[in-house]
């Protein structure tokens, strides 16, 4: 427990410092991973405005700075919760990430399954959900495609937010280029849940996406503070 307390004390002490300068600074006799601690500081600085409630909870952790950058805002997560969270009992979040969407789905759905392929993300998600007292979220460490193909359980709804950057960190706008490829997976997904909620880039060609996807019922274009 001393390590955990020391970690959180360090994060709190240097919460307003420049992360880049902290990485160049020398610290003695630390009993925790310095890089991970500074990642927490940088992540909290990035989510301060879009995730104010999470930022207020000093016991929450972030698996990476990227997870904080790419996470849904509380406003958009609540909006998605209103779309499917209150209507369906079991929801599967196929692209778990930081877990913001799973957390808000779990506020109204009976059961939420969080899928993420990176073990660290899963470990942090389990820890955070425990801190947040969300015991109706099941965390599974698996590639989403592998999970879909092997899973025999049916859900009321899937949520998917495909990665929209390639290995060179360039933005992707075509659904077929994103990972996982929802165009390829849609038939399989619809056999295991009647509803799919898909988040895509604001730069997407909506008309083409409607043609590529089957049975599109609604398109929601969301803007938060002109973004």
Question: How should each PLM-predicted stretch be described?
Answer:
Residues 1-227:
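SAM-dependent transferase fold signal centered on methyltransferase-like domains
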């Amino acid at each position: 427990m001393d390590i955990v307390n020391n970690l959180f004390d360090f994060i709190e002490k240097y919460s307003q410092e420049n992360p880049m300068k902290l990485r160049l600074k020398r610290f003695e006799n630390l009993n925790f991973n310095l890089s991970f601690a500074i990642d927490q500081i940088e992540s909290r600085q990035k989510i301060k405005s879009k995730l104010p409630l999470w930022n207020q909870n000093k016991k929450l952790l972030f698996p990476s700075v990227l997870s904080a950058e790419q996470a849904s805002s509380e406003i958009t997560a609540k909006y998605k919760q209103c779309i499917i969270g209150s209507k369906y009992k079991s929801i599967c979040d196929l692209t778990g990430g930081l877990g913001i969407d799973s957390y808000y789905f779990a506020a109204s759905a009976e059961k939420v399954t969080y899928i993420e392929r990176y073990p660290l993300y899963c470990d942090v998600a389990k820890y955070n959900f425990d801190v947040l007292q969300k015991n109706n979220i099941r965390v599974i460490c698996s590639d989403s495609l592998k999970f879909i193909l092997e899973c025999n359980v049916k859900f009321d709804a899937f949520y998917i937010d495909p990665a929209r950057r390639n290995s060179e960190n360039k933005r992707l706008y075509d659904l077929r280029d994103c990972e996982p490829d929802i165009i390829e997976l849609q038939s399989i997904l619809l056999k295991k849940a009647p509803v799919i909620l898909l988040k895509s880039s604001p730069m997407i060609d909506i008309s083409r996406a409607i043609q590529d996807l089957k049975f599109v019922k609604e398109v929601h274009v969301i803007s938060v503070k002109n973004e």
